[in-house]
């Protein structure tokens, strides 16, 4: 595997326990979980709430509710107990903000518990688990900011994602460096190849926001005009050769 931001490969990547390099499914899915619980608790009602089976509310009758992230129904009187599964798998997602996202998801689920009801986070330790257990989410957010600042990762800096042909992305990066000469030399990550071209990231201070975004906007317009301009004896080039997104909360790596 390699970093989707800078392209650095994880050399010698193996499982720390069995030393295997093969991947396997780490979650069985909500329906299978519900089926297993139904067999373990044969006389208990089991309700599945997910994207395919939306459930908004459940009554106060005894039941096991198996819900995926964000699909948790509101229980009348609150849940008598909440068990958060697959936490270790969720934290392994290919997302720079996955830890804070997990804390938000788990906190939202825990808030559905009845007063005094236990909430169990299975298989997770460390700062995220402590923040949930002590309900100190603001302190965790401050810790995350402190760790991201020296790495120049959002939201301590702003980020622009550029996708397009190699030439279009390279030209846009050159124009940004000219427009903002004080831009940090390590501000640009990439370009790296993608399925339909290349991708690069530009990390910049909030104070440089106006200049950087103006330069990128001008590059998008210039590239659009260039790709549509007919050349004598040839057909126009492909459209949408440069796409720029700024401050995207969840960049699709």
Region roles according to the model:
Residues 1-39:
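Cys/His-rich short segments
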Residues 18, 30, 52, 120-121:
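Residue-level detector of alpha-helical recognition elements and their boundaries
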Residues 23-52, 169-175:
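Short, charged N-terminal beta->alpha structural module
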Residues 40-41, 53-99, 104, 108-253:
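Accessory helical-bundle/CTD segments and flexible terminal tails appended to RecA-like ATPase motors
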